[in-house]
Amino acid sequence: MAVTMRQMLEAGVHFGHQTRFWNPKMAPFIFGHRNKIHIINLEKTLPMYNDALKYVRQLAANRGTILFVGTKRQSRDTIAEAAQRAGMPYVNARWLGGMLTNFKTLKVSIKRLKDMEAAVEAGELEKMSKKEALLFEREIAKLQKSIGGVKDMGGIPDAIFVVDVGYHKIAVTEANKLGVPVIAVVDTNHSPEGVDYVIPGNDDASKAVALYTQGVADAILEGRANAVNEVVQAVRGGDGDEFVEVNGEA
């Protein structure tokens, strides 16, 4: 379902930051200011948001992986819920330096987490002393919080979706180094540089964050559904072909 400009207004997408904190590189996307707060031009935001979703659909249709990134308090739960619904990896605690550029090290931690989870399933905790079990539980909880959202990410993602590029500067920089496309919400106090699909908008309001993330999750599911429908149509199209038996005898 397409998002309307009214929905963006109701979610507060148009509210930027205080004018004294603005980044001049966001000037093309600013409508004006009110009470020393920049107002984002939604006539620019809406088509750019739709362009980003179009790219997301295409990527999902081709079985691409999109990593959701949002570690700010007001976006953590929303990011996790949307990513899980779309079957995509996510980072909603803290971005660990090297998550992309040093993926080999991350894989070691992921293996450790999976091994520990398997041990819990096998009832290994019951064989430990109270102290050992406590230390084990602390470690697994720490790993689940930091990398639980990426434990099923088999490799470098095909794109990352970021809410607040300033807060997640390291993630954007790592993606840029590896040539991984960046889809991001950029507020008036940050630069859109390094972002392939810019969504000019409020990156603080929970309603606005929910609108972006739910839209991206929906686009992923739509892209996958479209790909499945195309396969079904192709198979059905072949049913109508006349079957001709080839006789090998001369």
Swiss-Prot record:
GO terms for molecular function: structural constituent of ribosome. The keyword Metal-binding does not apply. Keywords: Ribonucleoprotein, Ribosomal protein. SUPFAM superfamilies: Ribosomal protein S2. One of its GO terms (cellular component) is cytosolic small ribosomal subunit. Belongs to the universal ribosomal protein uS2 family. This is Small ribosomal subunit protein uS2.
